[in-house]
Amino acid sequence: MIIYFGIGTNLGDREANLRTALSLLDERVGQQLASSSIYRSAPQGFLSDNEFANIVVAYHTTYSLEDLLLITQKIEQEMGRTQKSVGGVYYDRIIDIDLLQAIHNSSFITHQSTTLTLPHPRMQERDFVMIPLKEVEDILNSK
């Protein structure tokens, strides 16, 4: 399965936060296939003076979607994230790792549970996801 993650940060050394998250994903998820360049954006859905740095990355993995969610939540915790966005209330964050979409045998996987929905239900509304996602898809399609 190929899993696409969206990673964002708007606190501290944002580029270092992205590197750390990528390193931890590399260790725990599987083979990294492609990563976008950094896309900078203003916060969406809340007020903050802190600009976001965002990337999208694709991995080949054998983990289940629910296991991947647990892995990403553990990485967020280890990196110091203390508040999760709940009910449409968003906060500044040192790291945010979202599962965006998954592909198996050239078909998109749809998944709905109490903890995870794929494809990500709001990714189409977010340039900070769609622009780097297109970059990653272009890289993968050129291989």
Language-model regions: role of each:
Residues M1-V29, S36-P43:
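N-terminal beta1-alpha1 ligand-phosphate binding loop
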